[in-house]
């Protein structure tokens, strides 16, 4: 401490000796250091504005001020006014006029906070006019302009008490510039910007002639308490008004937005919902474990009671009771439907060619509607509901403010470039990333200039289209040149000029001389982007060549805090005007973007060794979606081909090599596929007639889906026909009819359930999904109808061909000498009968299976609670898309989120004082105004998702009107008398301000408001008036023809939004904020009750659906269960137990699917919702056939009926449902589109696997325990039919093979179970007929 004090004394002595021999020998109260003006500073030239005159050296007593001089002093420097008789000053009238003029520039920025503005003025008033000037001012350098004249002061020292300086700085440190959404001190602190600014640096910048505004150099010394100065000098310690205090009765304190001390106590938003725990276990997990345990226990109890009940029944069974009325009712629907379809099938099989012709005519008639098809490719039209709130908001925004401009953006990182250190003269040692290398910047500048000068020929316009024809030009929208185009990049700090980029200069600072170059200028501009002239020896501007600042978060990315030199990526953004779809300029914009993409692809290839580049144009997303759709068409075609091949091969019943050509079902398989495709085309044509738009996704996916569903019915029908023996004397047509009567109710059950599920899925508001659901539902109905007609006719013709031993495909030839087919059951049926079913339904296996599936259900219930909701837009792209890298870079490097506009509708009066105060955020405004509420929200970005407070045209309009600035003036004479005079006009014709000076905040009258607002909106901002509204607010206020405001907007920024969950939550939070603002503004007198404030972000239309997709999904899926249960209940013969077990299996499939979606990275959204609706429909295929087979079986026990259903219908379901789905689904894994891979390949694979497991493993076990009792009505009918058949049995012997003894023509009796003694089939005792075909 002693050493420090000795050092201070030594410094004071040296300073005192230096002062003694310089220009201010007298330091005492009442003495000046300089007085009067001595012209311009000869050492300076090229200031940003006309620099003020410098003062004359004059160490003389202060002058007594009177008259006009006193009045001027009182107006300019009110704190130096001591009354009419006791006011002294060290400045002349000329000096006061110059001081007032020079302060007007800064006051334009600070006037919104009166305390700050007055404190700032007070500092410079004391320096220039204080009567005690010599106490704290010491001149250090003068120049002699002319002999005989007083020397002119070009440099001096000012000594302040540190507390005085820091209080003054503190009062200004939070004052904002609304248009730039930044702090005013950021442009008043030089290279340090707002982040590194403090009182010393703030004052140093004001005294630095290098800033282009200061007329002389001032060195500020801030002294701690107790530090003394020699020769009677005393540091200035004047009055400072805190920002939260007013200047007087008519003045207002600074607002919360400009002064932290003025802020009311804002309770922090509620913390993120804490996790729910029960003890140390997550609450949901604990609840699900309890639920699963109860479910398992209940199942065990039910099984036990059921087994015990069966044992009691077996002990008391003595006679066969007649079917009671409920059982007859249960049997009635089965009988009615069976007889109807049997009759129908017989008639169709009897007239196959007629039915085929009629079916073909109907399909063609409906397909003609495809000529009217409208394919939707616009992502907005595909993925957002036309009547959704977001679409309405978008329509309002586009109508009143124009569409959000089209963004063409480039991210660039350096390959194999390590970071390096740079010792900056201004900021000391700084780390620079590899991308910030001069040679790379030069190459990127060449790229940027090539893109800026890019031209492309338009055949429609018959001329070249260039960037200036379509670009967004905020400062010159009507007569745009190339340099007016908004291009944001780091290179704009050098005005896109190679020469300026290479510029170097020697600079001395604090006694150290060093070379400064582009790196110093970059550091300066990144910290102070509003700078018109940096403080380096380069003296370069930071303003882009189109006239606006480039903020660092839009030019560089991948940095921490404010370490911009460590940025890993450079960002180049071309902003292009957006136009309506029918505007010719939209085609021009897309044409230029196409050329932009080609240039970028070429540059990416040629510089792959230097740069890693990601880029995007506005048209890119739509282009890539369309590209992948076309690319994946062959994948879908192969999928259809494989399913067709499988059907063709699997439908055949092969017994001998010599009969392969005859027993093949290629034609029948092709016909089945044609039936499916015909149903799809007919459905699409039908909706085209109605004007319902379609999409490429429908063309891809719906045929595949309907083929998978339709192939199931084809298999079940054909296999049943092959297995069902022909009755004695039964014609082929009757045989087909009887087969159809047996399986058609089951086909109807599945098709109807699936179609209803799809139609319910159309309740979603997403257009693409809605159209997909409608088309799929109708296609399934048409598919069922065509299967009941065209396919039955095809089977009739194919059976006739096979029975005539004609080869498939080339049926014109006949093979008469072929041996008859062998009677055998087939490998699949054999496997199910001998191996699978006995193992599955073993007494020890069944409880294990039941327990495992219940545990799996419980586990997936928990996983279901953790599924992510949303759809990231990159999933709509192919895996090889260049946009994948773009979205990756966007999320990794962009340090700010998208802009969010708070739009106001008509019905609010902005022109009243109350109306303005409820909107603005400067002095005199309400504490909970619109902009203040957004400011409060921005202080909690993790909850509000707002990171940067809103710009406000109301605030800047008020500041623009302030008389102390040079912004709003009126011509007092000349040809433009009484018209607006721009701040660039310095003539004496513009001496009248728009508003008179007031003691309180400036507020225009209603008449003044409507008169001056258009002037403000068309005023170009410049150094003399930075508040001009042309650049920032030209499109922010929509005026009617009579000047009334019908819409306005206030722009803020979200925090970085990385995924769809962030976008969804940001939309939710901004709507809550807007609703709160709306409720507050409706309290302002004169406000329309329908007035509204709403948030608009360009992405809202895509993420609106995710606000409600969860409850909508639960409702839709729950709704799907109702018709599924009802249809099953009705078509299974009013069997409620079968319906419940059927529904239970479907619910378990659905829950397991959703749970495993979370494991496999499949998010929940509208696309997955429609697939889950499909899952309900497809689950019906897996379980309903087996449930119905169990219900109509006449075996005496549940276990035997379960075995019977598993062997016969289970094998058919495996061959017809699972095996027709698997090949097509697996092929989808090769699709390029991630949307197809994730939401159709993965999800449908899960659905098929889980459906297969539940249908062929879980359901038979459950039915063996809890299935319904045997239907005695069916038992009775079977008994009567058997007795009738035995009575009519012919006496002629049977042939050992189903062939005519003389001609050997094949007779299709189907598969005869009498050759398999192990199966006690009801039909095994039926006699055979020698009917030949």
From Swiss-Prot:
Disulfide bonds join 32-90, 38-56, 77-125, 91-129, 113-254, 116-172, 189-197, 243-259, 256-263, 471-485, 525-542, 920-925, 967-1025, 981-990. Residues 306-352, 654-665, 718-742, 798-846, 1135-1142, 1187-1206, 1264-1333 are cytoplasmic. It catalyses: cholesterol(in) = cholesterol(out); sitosterol(out) = sitosterol(in). Disruption phenotype: Mice have multiple lipid transport defects and have a protective effect against diet-induced hyperlipidemia. They have also a deregulation of CAV1 transport and localization, suggesting that the observed lipid transport defect may be the indirect result of an inability of cells to properly target and/or regulate CAV1 expression. The keyword rRNA-binding does not apply. One of its GO terms (molecular function) is lipid transporter activity. Residues 632-797 form the SSD domain. Residues 21-284, 374-632, 687-696, 764-776, 868-1113, 1164-1165, 1228-1242 are extracellular. Expressed in small intestine, stomach and muscle, along with detectable expression in lung, heart, gall bladder, brain, testis, skin and liver. Expression in liver is extremely low. Highly glycosylated. Gene3D superfamilies: Multidrug efflux transporter AcrB transmembrane domain. Keywords: Cell membrane, Cholesterol metabolism, Disulfide bond, Glycoprotein, Lipid metabolism, Membrane, Signal, Steroid metabolism, Sterol metabolism, Transmembrane, Transmembrane helix, Transport. It is a multi-pass membrane protein. The chain crosses the membrane at residues 285-305, 353-373, 633-653, 666-686, 697-717, 743-763, 777-797, 847-867, 1114-1134, 1143-1163, 1166-1186, 1207-1227, 1243-1263. The keyword Acyltransferase does not apply. InterPro entries: HMGCR/SNAP/NPC1-like_SSD, NPC1-like, NPC1_MLD, NPC1_N, SSD. It is found in: Apical cell membrane; Cell membrane. Interacts with RAB11A, MYO5B and RAB11FIP2. Interaction with RAB11A, MYO5B and RAB11FIP2 is required for proper transport to the plasma membrane upon cholesterol depletion. Interacts with NPC2. Interacts with LIMA1. Belongs to the patched family. This is NPC1-like intracellular cholesterol transporter 1. It comes from Mus musculus (Mouse). The gene is Npc1l1.
